[in-house]
Design a protein with these regions (language model features):
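Short strand-edge motifs at loop-to-beta-strand transitions and within beta-strands
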Residues: 55-59, 156-160, 254-258, 355-359, ...
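Surface-exposed, short loops/turns at beta-strand junctions within beta-sandwich domains
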Residues: 61-69, 162-170, 260-268, 361-369, ...
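Aromatic/hydrophobic beta-strand junction motif of beta-rich domains
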Residues: 23-29, 122-128, 222-228, 323-327, ...
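Short, solvent-exposed loop/linker segments at the N-terminal edge
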Residues: 11-21, 109-120, 210-220, 308-319, ...
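Flexible, low-complexity linkers/stalks enriched in Thr/Pro that connect modular domains
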Residues: 2-9, 86-104, 179, 188-208, ...
């Protein structure tokens, strides 16, 4: 017998391994052979081969042969009656396990088994790969393109790790195993998502009470809103450089919010925000903010030089009096003076000049009472106002009448025979000084106010000689206004 061949050998050529349960054999013998028969049970039962051509005989098993190793016995007989036998060992293998592929546990960086990873070169574990596997191939589909890679079998079993970094995105992997018999098996596809980074889009101090975006608030319980990508599942905040953390809550709108439950101290603070996505990526961002809840109470006073009456009585004879404003903090963003006069109020915005806060009306004020209040707002939105200051503008006074009381002639002729003339001066009630002179103002004598306000009397203390005189009377009111009037009289 020259040769025995397993025609449907499905593995490596001539390895006598097939996945066909009906093996087919070809026997090559000399041309004078006239009978070829085959047996799979050691010669107990024989089947006759069919001559295909001179010296070539064939036989395909008509019924299924069991899985496993077999010994084929071939017997050839020539026309002279010579008989020869030869055997062939062959194996039938029709089974192959279905492989599986899974993301390696340490590289499944999100929730376990969610097939999310932040590793650009993740490792995959291949299981249920039979020992007789001749080829193990991993197909990777990404962005519409499929690429195949050979898996490796090491001490830890079959594994696959990409040779270069994968870009972020979805990857679908499937395993194809071919055994030595040519059986092929495919895994169920596995889709993994590579997500290697996350961002924090914005951090907003919601109760920013100053200029929007200046991160200044007068709230001791600051409220923060954090905007992040939709795959973020944890947002936490810290005010002490990460020593302690609090978890934000996701709102219905998708933003993450947190209102500090305890009072935060006055001053500057650094908020640290950490966002973690479902792949386990982390992003950190900081926000500087300031809590300012205090604002000094301003004061307003009439300038000393314009307080023309008794110091501190807030009466002035200036039509455009000046006012000094104190207690204005350096972080004041708006300073206003509210002036109320005759039931009408006007708000006037002030600016600091040469480091000084001062207010002077732009035009003359008419006589009367004016109530001034200073309102201050700082950059944090705190507000404070002064106690009201009421000033009286009084720019004029008059002398109503001068009477020679001891007029001894015709009433009103201002002639007297008394060398101690007695004068009565009638003035407004706010006059607080009345003085008299008969020497052109060289010397003065102060009149005395009577029990009736506005009536002042003066008796000349020394003898006045006979003759004509000009009495000069000067009245000064509480605002410092002066009025002068003369009276001609005769002592005879």
């Amino acid at each position: 017998i020259d040769r025995i061949e397993l025609v449907n050998d499905s593995g490596e050529p001539a390895d006598n391994l097939t996945n066909d349960v009906r093996p087919e054999f070809r026997v090559t013998v000399p041309e004078d052979v006239n009978r070829v028969r085959l047996s799979l049970d050691g010669g107990r039962k024989w089947v006759d081969a069919t001559k295909a051509s001179a010296g070539v005989w064939g036989y395909a098993w008509p019924s299924d042969v069991t899985e496993g190793a077999h010994v084929l016995t071939v017997e050839a007989t020539d026309i002279a009656g010579n008989t020869v036998m030869r055997t062939l060992d062959f194996t039938i293998d029709t089974t192959l396990s279905t492989p599986t592929i899974e993301l390696d546990g340490p590289d499944d960086t999100g929730v376990q088994s969610d097939n999310l990873t932040n590793r650009p070169q993740p490792t995959f574990i291949l299981k249920h790969v039979d020992a007789d596997a001749a080829s193990v191939v991993v197909s990777v589909k990404h962005g519409g393109t499929t690429t195949t890679f050979a898996a490796t079998n090491g001490a830890g079993g079959w594994r696959f790790t990409p040779a270069s970094d994968w870009a972020d995105g979805a990857y679908t992997l499937s395993v194809t195993v071919t055994d030595k018999a040519g059986n092929v098996s495919h895994s169920v596809p596995l889709t993994v998502n590579v997500d290697t980074h996350v961002t924090i889009d914005s951090i907003v101090l919601v109760n920013d009470s100053g200029v929007i975006g200046d991160n200044l608030t007068n709230e001791v319980r600051p409220h923060f809103r954090v905007t992040v990508p939709g795959d973020v599942n944890v947002v936490r905040l810290s005010l002490n450089d990460g020593k302690t953390w609090v978890n934000a809550t996701q709102s219905a709108a998708g933003d993450w919010e947190y209102i500090w439950p305890d009072d935060v101290t006055e001053g500057k603070h650094t908020l640290t925000v950490e966002a973690t996505d479902i792949a386990g990526n982390k992003a950190t961002q900081m926000l500087e903010f300031t809590i300012d809840t205090t604002l000094s109470t301003p004061t307003i006073r009439l300038d000393t030089v314009d307080d023309s009456g008794v110091p501190g009585d807030n009466i002035t004879n200036e039509k455009m009096p000046g006012f000094t404003i104190n207690g204005i903090d350096a972080d004041a963003s708006q300073v206003m003076v509210v002036v109320t006069h005759n039931g009408k109020s006007e708000e006037l915005t002030l600016t600091q000049v040469s480091g000084r806060w001062h207010f002077t009306p732009d035009s003359d004020w008419t006589d009367g009472n004016y109530t001034l209040t200073v309102k201050v707002e700082d950059k944090a939105g705190n507000m404070s106002q002064s106690s009201p200051l009421t000033v009286t503008v009084d720019t004029q006074t008059v002398i109503n009448s001068i009477v020679l009381v001891n007029d001894s002639g015709i009433v009103g002729d201002n002639m007297t025979n008394n060398v101690h003339p007695h004068f009565r001066v009638t003035v407004p009630e706010d006059v607080n000084v009345v003085r008299l002179s008969i020497d052109g103002g060289t010397t003065w004598g102060n009149a005395t106010q009577s029990a009736v306000k506005g009536i002042w009397n003066y008796n000349w203390p020394t003898d006045v000689g006979d003759g004509k005189y000009t009495l000069m009377v000067e009245a000064i009111d509480a605002a410092g206004n002066k009025a002068t009037q003369t009276l001609e009289f005769i002592v005879d």
